[in-house]
């Protein structure tokens, strides 16, 4: 296959760090270094330093929406960015976000007539619920999201669970599972680095060490972990637990841990950006605890597997895909009692944990080179299908945009009419209440006058 020029589009990119930004960075680095040529297109950021990358990064105008959605929102209808990209000779466009990035990608497709692939990474229904309070507007946002995704020539998801989530939003088209990779090599780091990284914590070698790495948010299942550890301690088991990461719920989580009386056994390490130091924690631990049903990919589970560390996961979760219970990981129901029971069973079986970790390393590990290589091969098939006219024709974004604006205006009119009707109702109730108060005051005056006449 000839070398391809790939346009990678995403809403987040360094200095903003998340799983999708990491995926796009790896796609660009591997394609540009080994396979073809890649350009990243992403919103502008005043703190960005793109000189550090060995591939082109093209920025377009943005708004600061970090407090609302965690990253800057791009303005995809910028004519300047379209003019800049139009002459770059791209063979394919690959969007990694179904909102503004895909809007920009659709406009670019109309100009340069190449196929558009979109990867669905995260559960956007949760993001929509967090960002929009109105149920009516939430449903309309989901409809527009699905419409935007369906307008792509091919849709990929990072896991089967991500595909099921996409279906739950109303998407009815086909999709291909294209998993992400891990930027760790398979194997352990040096013992000297492990000792250096973990030296500040009370971690006796004779005790099992449990580990969590990720954002410190309750929706990651952290309450299940802490409640299970409290049960474990009450049962007389001795152990150690380390949480590595930052996040909006970190202080609440630490306070809850203190309330449970676990501070002698549970330690909190801030977020670590040095990847080898994170590997050191994976290599030091006996078991990785990740009872999250939120994540669509469970990348940290594959990171742990790269280091030979087995995970305890919720059966049926995306993170547990391809994991065989007792062979390449340990599966439980989504509650603290199940977690506690499994940990009690394993506390005295450190060799079993090690053997299962070795199987996880062999069965679950996927390098980014392998993951991007698969995607790059699929690019060739997508381009061929597009040129042969095998994908359905999609309406122009301008048509969709006009309809979306009309629908949004109708929703706004409906919302405004409801608010105005409610305001009129409140005014009427206020007038009635005011009149009732006047009448009540008059009755009280008359009653007092009658009593005074009686006694005077």
What role is predicted for each listed range?
Residues 58-61, 138, 143-193:
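Donor nucleotide-sugar binding/catalytic pocket of nucleotide-sugar-dependent glycosyltransferases
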Residues 352-366, 370, 377:
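A short, well-ordered alpha-helix in the C-terminal region of glycosyltransferases
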Residues 149, 271, 279-285:
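Short alpha-helical donor nucleotide-sugar binding micro-motif in glycosyltransferases
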Residues 293:
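Aromatic "clamp/platform" in nucleotide-sugar-dependent glycosyltransferases that forms part
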Residues 1-59, 369, 404-456:
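N-terminal subdomain of nucleotide-sugar transferases
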Residues 310-314:
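Short hydrophobic beta-strand element within catalytic cores of glycosyltransferases
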Residues 254-272:
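Nucleotide-activated donor-binding/catalytic signature segment of Leloir-type glycosyltransferases, i.e.
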Residues 325-326, 330-336, 345-350:
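Conserved acidic donor-binding segment of nucleotide-sugar-dependent glycosyltransferases
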């Amino acid at each position: 296959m000839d070398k391809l020029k790939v346009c990678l589009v995403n809403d987040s990119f360094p200095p903003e760090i998340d799983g999708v930004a990491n995926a796009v960075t790896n796609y660009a680095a591997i394609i540009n270094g080994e396979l073809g040529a890649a350009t990243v297109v992403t919103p502008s950021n005043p703190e960005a330093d793109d000189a550090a990358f060995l591939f082109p990064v093209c920025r377009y105008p943005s708004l600061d929406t970090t407090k609302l959605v965690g990253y800057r929102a791009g303005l995809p209808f910028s004519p300047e960015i379209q003019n800049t990209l139009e002459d770059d000779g791209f063979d394919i466009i690959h969007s990694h976000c179904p909102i503004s990035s895909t809007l920009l990608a659709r406009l670019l497709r109309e100009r340069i007539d190449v196929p558009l692939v979109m990867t669905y990474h995260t559960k956007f229904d949760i993001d929509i619920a967090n960002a929009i309070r109105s149920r009516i507007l939430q449903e309309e946002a989901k409809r527009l999201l699905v419409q935007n995704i369906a307008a792509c020539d091919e849709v990929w998801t990072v896991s089967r669970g991500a595909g099921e989530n996409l279906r739950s939003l109303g998407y009815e088209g086909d999709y291909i599972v294209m998993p992400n990779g891990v930027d760790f090599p398979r194997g352990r780091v040096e013992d000297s680095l492990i000792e250096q990284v973990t030296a500040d914590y009370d971690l006796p070698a004779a005790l099992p060490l449990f580990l969590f790495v990720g954002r410190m948010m309750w929706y990651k299942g952290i309450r299940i972990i802490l409640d299970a550890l409290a049960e474990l301690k009450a049962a007389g088991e001795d152990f150690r637990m380390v949480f590595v990461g930052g996040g909006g719920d970190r202080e609440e989580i630490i306070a809850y841990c203190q309330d449970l009386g676990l501070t002698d056994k549970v330690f909190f390490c801030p977020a670590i950006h040095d990847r080898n130091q994170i590997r050191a924690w994976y290599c030091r631990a006996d078991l990785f605890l990740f009872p999250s049903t939120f994540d669509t990919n469970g990348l940290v589970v594959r990171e742990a597997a790269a280091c030979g560390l087995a995970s305890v996961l919720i059966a049926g979760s995306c993170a547990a895909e391809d994991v065989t219970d007792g062979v390449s990981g340990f599966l439980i129901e989504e509650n603290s009692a199940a977690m506690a029971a499994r940990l009690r069973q394993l506390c005295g079986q450190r060799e079993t944990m090690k053997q299962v970790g070795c199987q996880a390393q062999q069965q679950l590990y996927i390098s980014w080179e392998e993951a991007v290589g698969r995607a790059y091969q699929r690019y060739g098939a997508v381009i061929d299908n597009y040129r042969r006219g095998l994908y359905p024709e999609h309406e122009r974004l301008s048509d969709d945009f006009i309809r979306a604006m009309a629908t949004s205006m109708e929703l706004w009119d409906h919302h405004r009419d409801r608010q105005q009707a409610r305001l009129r109702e409140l005014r009427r109730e206020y007038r009635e209440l005011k009149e009732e108060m006047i009448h009540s005051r008059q009755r009280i005056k008359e009653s007092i006058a009658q009593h005074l006449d009686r006694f005077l």
